[in-house]
Amino acid sequence: MNKRMNELVALLNRYATEYYTSDNPSVSDSEYDRLYRELVELETAYPEQVLADSPTHRVGGKVLDGFEKYSHQYPLYSLQDAFSCEELDAFDARVRKEVAHPTYICELKIDGLSISLTYEKGILVAGVTRGDGSIGENITENLKRVKDIPLTLPEELDITVRGECYMPRASFDQVNQARQENGEPEFANPRNAAAGTLRQLDTAVVAKRNLATFLYQEASPSTRDSQEKGLKYLEQLGFVVNPKRILAENIDEIWNFIQEVGQERENLPYDIDGVVIKVNDLASQEELGFTVKAPKWAVAYKFPAEEKEAQLLSVDWTVGRTGVVTPTANLTPVQLAGTTVSRATLHNVDYIAEKDIRKDDTVIVYKAGDIIPAVLRVVESKRVSEEKLDIPTNCPSCNSDLLHFEDEVALRCINPRCPAQIMEGLIHFASRDAMNITGLGPSIVEKLFAANLVKDVADIYRLQEEDFLLLEGVKEKSAAKLYQAIQASKENSAEKLLFGLGIRHVGSKVSQLLLQYFHSIENLSQADSEEVASIESLGGVIAKSLQTYFATEGSEILLRELKETGVNLDYKGQTVVADAALSGLTVVLTGKLERLKRSEAKSKLESLGAKVTGSISKKTDLVVVGADAGSKLQKAQELGIQVRDEAWLESL
């Protein structure tokens, strides 16, 4: 029976690839169904012989309890956006300062959900969402139901690949028709539908909705020397790679491709929202490196957003956690990018003056970055009033005088006891990217603050279960869950806490970078600004902001109180040791290692202070080689780069 099951699995997987990947089926649907039923019968009779790559894993029935957090071994960076040819020119100029004659590769920017797929010995072991780039959610069981994702690879590889999971337009129409017939609300757009599907706890629902993928990158150190070769390699492994791409030598060629894609966009069977431009050569990518948030070797050109006219009804002014006062326009409702929009940001007081926005104006609204509704400009031909908007002089929360500093575009409240700032700071502290306290959202924080149960973030850790029962609408079960979530957050790695403190210019990526170097918030609080500014990707502005924050008596008291309540102040990730054996060295791993997994070798190198990259360049200090090292070993020898073997690495 095992032989026949092997034959059926191989046949069905080949036919599925022909159908879903190549769009060139060699058998009829009825023949596929006949073979599939035969396999199901055999697997039912011999469950102990079911193969890992059996197509039956893709259908049917598992109801999941939830999604576990998953730490990405290789961080997923965001991309810098560009909205004009001039911004692409600026990107090209920055690249050419480091790379004399770059070749670019242009790929379609699929409007889906970023995913990371990890294979061990050629078997899919983890499918994860992007999350915040460092930690995502493990949705492996759902991604196994996406029919064009290989469950096994033709080689026994340890590899992590990245791509986009999306819902084709035809599938979107079918899903929405079914929801309409069932009296369920329709999805606004294919991206929302894909996101909602991947969040399903019932995997059978995922299997029915016909999601698809395009893979675009090997995240683990690549064995290829260019992005184009990497894409071809992914195709060889059985992944679906978007064929619509070009190599370009200059911005004119890139711009022509963007214009061509823009004209074809509506006729594609899937949604795109732009074109991604990357330096093709991987060694050049290594030379260019990264900022804290994004690679310097890539940019995402975004197509102009959809625009609609709406009438300005009124303006609300709100205070954020840093004291900035932001105006929000209340508008006549309009349909925009699949959703109803009745509020849009006006950014700041200088923006209102620059655009000369007045009462009752008709304005053009769009979604900035396809996400945030914003007012773009006034339709002056439809102006009905010359009356200017009322600009507040006092804080809408605490009534303190508002200031408008010369070097700032916004009004600002500088009262440290401003209730709105304190409450927004508490909401930020509990948010997903900060301390990630499940259930402690804005509405609960507002109730706690109004009940005078919390005045600063340390108070959160003094709360007891019974305190939550004092809040309207909170029952015993919810109170217990909130208390447990707060206790669990005490164990977070310290970069979550540092970001949660809301220090100006210190975002989540900067927080992680700082803690990798200083290992604890207490060490960081004692560091001098020169030491902070010397860290790669940081600088004087961040160093000064940290120095200002930690110099205050309030910060010292707050850290002491947090520590006393049991909150962890130490970094739990991979640290950088200043005097480690390989501190500051750029190292490339190549070839097949005999005793260590590649991930183990990478972790060891990083623990010794090395930066592990995938391509050899003039910035490479050391190459660790295994069997069949090939062209990378040859290139290292040509460049005179030091070469070591696996035994040497194990001896460190």
UniProtKB/Swiss-Prot annotation:
For Zn(2+), which residues are the binding ones? C395, C398, C413, C418
Q: Which UniProt keywords are present, listed alphabetically?
A: DNA damage, DNA repair, DNA replication, Ligase, Magnesium, Manganese, Metal-binding, NAD, Zinc
Q: Which CDD domains match?
A: BRCT_DNA_ligase_like, LIGANc
| Residues that hold NAD(+) according to the record | D29, S30, E31, Y32, D33, S78, L79, E107, R130, E164, K278, K302
Locate the active site.
Answer: K109 (n6-amp-lysine intermediate)
What Pfam family does this protein match (any one)? BRCT
Q: List, in alphabetical order, the Gene Ontology terms for molecular function in this entry.
A: DNA binding; DNA ligase (NAD+) activity; metal ion binding
What SUPFAM superfamilies does the record tag this protein with?
Answer: BRCT domain, DNA ligase/mRNA capping enzyme, catalytic domain, Nucleic acid-binding proteins, RuvA domain 2-like
* EC number(s) per entry: 6.5.1.2
Reactions that this protein is recorded to catalyse: NAD(+) + (deoxyribonucleotide)n-3'-hydroxyl + 5'-phospho-(deoxyribonucleotide)m = (deoxyribonucleotide)n+m + AMP + beta-nicotinamide D-nucleotide
Give the GO terms filed under biological process for this record.
Answer: DNA repair; DNA replication
Question: Which InterPro entries does the protein's record reference?
Answer: BRCT_dom, BRCT_dom_sf, DisA/LigA_HHH, DNA_ligase, DNA_ligase_AS, DNA_ligase_CS, DNAligase_adenylation, DNAligase_N
Does the keyword section mention DNA damage? yes
**Family per similarity comment:** Belongs to the NAD-dependent DNA ligase family. LigA subfamily.
- Function summary: DNA ligase that catalyzes the formation of phosphodiester linkages between 5'-phosphoryl and 3'-hydroxyl groups in double-stranded DNA using NAD as a coenzyme and as the energy source for the reaction. It is essential for DNA replication and repair of damaged DNA.
Q: What is this protein called?
A: DNA ligase
